[in-house]
């Protein structure tokens, strides 16, 4: 991953790097790889994440169609 440093502004470059890493999901990946996750736990986690995604998408779709009031 590469970030340009303009005018020796290291702080701005660090912020840009952190933003890129956040978008790419690197922080989440590092956190997940911190400890070993059993395959059964991984399947359960991924299934729960998929259910959450589907529910979120359905909720957004319902809000867009006016069936549910926005929070």
Swiss-Prot record:
Gene Ontology MF annotations: structural constituent of ribosome
Alphabetical keyword list: Ribonucleoprotein, Ribosomal protein
Domain of life, source organism: Bacteria
One of the GO BP terms on file: translation
UniProt lineage: Bacteria, Pseudomonadati, Pseudomonadota, Alphaproteobacteria, Hyphomicrobiales
Family stated for the protein in its record: Belongs to the bacterial ribosomal protein bS21 family.
PANTHER family (alphabetical): MITOCHONDRIAL 28S RIBOSOMAL PROTEIN S21, SMALL RIBOSOMAL SUBUNIT PROTEIN BS21M
S-S pairs: none
One Pfam short name: Ribosomal_S21
Assigned GO CC terms: ribonucleoprotein complex; ribosome
Protein name per the record: Small ribosomal subunit protein bS21B
């Amino acid at each position: 991953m590469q970030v340009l440093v303009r005018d020796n502004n290291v702080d701005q470059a660090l912020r840009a790097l952190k933003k890129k890493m956040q978008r790419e999901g690197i922080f989440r990946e590092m956190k997940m790889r911190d400890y070993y996750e059993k395959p059964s736990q991984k399947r359960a986690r991924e299934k729960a994440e998929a259910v959450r995604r589907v529910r979120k998408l359905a909720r957004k779709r319902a809000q867009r169609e006016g069936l549910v009031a926005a929070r």
